[in-house]
Amino acid sequence: APYADLIWMETGNPDLGMAREFAQGIHAKFPGKMLAYNCSPSFNWAKYMDVKAMTTFREDLAAMGYKFQFITLAGFHANNTVMFELSKAYMDRGMAGYSELQQREFALESSGFQAIKHQSFVGTGYFDAVQQVCQQGQSSTTALAGSTETEQFH
């Protein structure tokens, strides 16, 4: 502990009691030592906690000194779930299935979601600018200006 910036706690299920005991033990000898907790996707969260407990789990850990809380493979699970749902929707309803996903993206835009404008989101404007510099402003193959994205999503 004296040589670590952060100490990682691992449990076999979401267990605030064990997390508290660990934190108290570390902080008794190393006050203020930052702690990390893996909110593992391998846990069946609903098996161990009700919704209320899950809702405050993050704050409960933070109060114990767990400054770094993370869900390993959260993106993996989210991407695979959405791709499964999209594939099924596309199989069942064709392009209407995809459009339903797109409409969800539009609805999320007011909350800060930006990926609906995927060309600008991934930096196409930057690469267009680099291409224009390299071509002395004479490039005819830039991607963003005059694109369907610019026309339909801005």
Role assignments for model-derived ranges:
Residues 80-96:
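C-terminal helical cap(s) of enzyme catalytic domains, especially alpha/beta-barrels
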